[in-house]
Amino acid sequence: MNKILVDSSVWIGFFKGQEEAKQLFQLIDSNMICTNDLIMTELIPSLIHKNEIELVNILTSIEKVTIEIDWNGITQMQIQNLKNGLNRVGVPDLIIAQNAIQNKLALYSFDKHFELMKKGFGLTMFIGR
């Protein structure tokens, strides 16, 4: 199985102890996950602000994949989303989706718009238990 890119929505659920995010423990232990700079940028500032240094250390120890933004591809994804009635997908989430596709990673997210995007773009979603 390919690695899994874990979106900030799952990490936030994990940090809050949400039941649906608890399988992340197993994925961390089996070295199945990765992150990128965008996801880290979404998470790290609030963790440092809350003095959650141990969580910051966990996050920074996880493999990071490089983001290579194809802006034309991002524009095309957004156009296709609008045609499909998805008009609330922000640029950061488009970049995360593109990053997962480029690196052949499954994306683990609680954000429903990723599930709606997967068909048209070849995005693979990690389906938890």
Regions inferred by a protein language model and the residue ranges of each:
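Acidic, PIN/NYN-like endoribonuclease modules and their adjacent C-terminal/linker elements
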Residues: 1-3, 97, 101-129
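Short, well-structured N-terminal submotif of metal-dependent ribonuclease cores
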Residues: 1-35, 45-57
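Histidine- and aromatic-rich ligand-binding microenvironments
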Residues: 6-7, 35-36, 89-90, 111, ...
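A generic structural signal for short hydrophobic patches within well-formed alpha-helices
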Residues: 11-12, 40-43, 114-115
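Structured helix-beta-strand junction loops
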Residues: 30-31, 58-62, 84, 103, ...
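Active-site-proximal, substrate-binding regions of enzyme catalytic domains
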Residues: 38, 47-69, 73-76
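Short, hinge-like loop/turn segments at secondary-structure boundaries
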Residues: 50-54, 82-83, 125-128
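Active-site neighborhoods of divalent-metal-dependent phosphate/nucleic-acid chemistry enzymes
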Residues: 65-106, 110
